[in-house]
Regions:
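Glycine-rich phosphate/pyrophosphate-binding beta-alpha loops
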Residues: 95-96, 120-125, 167-168, 328-333
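A short core secondary-structure module
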Residues: 112, 116-162
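A structural signal for short hydrophobic beta-strand segments in well-ordered beta-sheet cores
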Residues: 104-107
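Alpha-helix capping/hinge segments and adjacent helical runs
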Residues: 12, 122, 283, 287-371
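Glycine-rich beta->alpha junctions and the first turn(s) of the following alpha-helix
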Residues: 159-262, 329, 365-371
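Short, charged, amphipathic alpha-helical segments
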Residues: 248-253, 280-287
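A short, Trp-centered hydrophobic/proline-enriched beta-strand micro-motif
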Residues: 82-90, 133-134
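Internal helix-loop-helix
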Residues: 12-83, 124-130, 213, 258, ...
């Protein structure tokens, strides 16, 4: 079944939807096992990526943890009805992995907030209705203490959106320029100047989503087959290497990696739920997912050989096109290096890495060569 907005809305209207979300917000309030069963049964069907990630697995999950009751009823309910798509507006052109160092500013003017700045690498923002936008609202305090999260309408006239074309031809990411975007007090998620608490939960859900371990995902199918696991038997046949012992051995190693990744998702979910692991333990899924995908992409290209060479669109095997985006899996949802830091500091309780700007008011922190 082909995926798309109409397919998504039809599925949601027929109650093929997020089983775990509470009934008061439009979900079914069922145990995790129900969602897992649905995911298995729906694996052969496509599911629009933007509904799973970032709408439900990241944004709705974050609102469920941090938003006010009216925001939950309004936005989670609309998303479940297929009427609203939510995205993240977090990363910035100048920010790199330092999310707390955002430069997008929000100033209070009367009973309104006016937001100015730039965001980038926003997944599927071109199709979104609202974005969770992290902005700086206080500059004379350390960087983590002066942030506020806002729900911003993407169609606001002050937002200019551009799609980013990647090396593999995909244009799912966008960059946004915010100029005088005014929103009311009801757009604030959580508390003013306490947006890092909201962002931290958002990052937690993002890492689980990127690692394919979110309990709020619905359906195991991909959109357009772009994330469908590699069929090594078919790939070997297409490459003319179906009888190779080396191919069978190499593919077997990758499949073991895949099986371990699937079991890890279940183990980490249970361990975080019962308190055996801290919430940051979800980052284990994100890290191992990246290692698994890179292993599979390397294996697929090795099996494809010259048939994996990418020329014009539509030429060659899918293995080559996928390989072009290989490194992105080590960046999305926070870099692999950041994931290792989180695991070391918050799961294994290693000493924190030194940071020169810790405890320093943000307006006194050096940015490039400026102060």
């Amino acid at each position: 079944m082909a995926a798309g907005p109409r397919t998504a809305k039809a599925a949601l209207r027929r109650r093929i939807r997020r089983d775990l979300l509470p009934r008061e917000y439009g979900g079914q309030g069922l145990p995790y096992e129900y969602q897992r069963a649905f995911d298995e049964e729906s694996r052969c069907y496509e599911m629009p990526l933007i509904l799973n990630t970032p709408t439900f697995t990241i944004c709705c999950a974050t609102l469920l943890d941090t938003a006010g009751e009216e925001q939950k009823k309004t936005h989670i309910g609309a998303a479940l009805r297929g009427e609203e798509v939510l995205v993240q507006l977090l990363s910035e052109p100048s920010g790199g992995s330092d999310l707390a160092g955002v430069l997008t500013r929000a100033e209070r003017r009367g009973d309104r907030w006016v937001i100015d700045g730039a965001k980038t690498w926003s997944t599927s923002a071109f199709a979104a209705d609202y974005g969770l936008c992290l902005a700086r609202t206080a500059w004379d305090v350390p960087k983590h203490e002066g942030l506020t999260m806002f729900l911003v309408p993407i169609d606001h006239p002050g937002i200019t959106l551009r799609r980013i074309t990647q090396v593999n031809g995909s244009s799912e990411f966008c960059e946004e320029f915010l100029d005088g975007v005014d929103v009311g007090e009801d757009a604030v998620v959580g508390e003013v100047n306490h947006g890092w608490a909201v962002a931290s939960r958002q990052l937690y859900h993002e890492r689980r989503a990127v690692g394919m371990g979110s309990e709020f995902a619905s359906g195991g199918g991909s959109e357009g087959g772009h994330t469908t696991p590699v069929d090594y038997a078919e790939l070997a046949r297409q490459a003319g290497r179906a009888d190779s012992d080396w191919v069978r051995e190499t593919a077997g190693r990758a499949l073991v990696h895949r099986a371990v990744a699937e079991q890890l998702i279940e183990h980490v979910y249970r361990s975080v739920s019962d308190g055996t692991l801290p919430p940051a333990g979800g980052t284990l899924i994100r890290l191992f997912h990246a290692e698994t995908v890179m292993c599979e992409m390397d294996t697929a290209l090795a099996i494809a050989g010259a048939a994996g060479v990418v020329g014009q669109p539509g030429e060659g095997l899918q293995a080559g096109l996928r390989y072009l985006a290989r490194q992105s899996v080590a960046i999305g949802g926070g870099t692999t290096e950041m994931a290792r830091n989180v695991i070391g500091e918050r799961v294994l309780n290693f000493p924190r890495e030194y940071a020169a700007d810790r405890g320093v008011p943000f307006n006194q922190v050096r940015h490039g060569q400026a102060r």
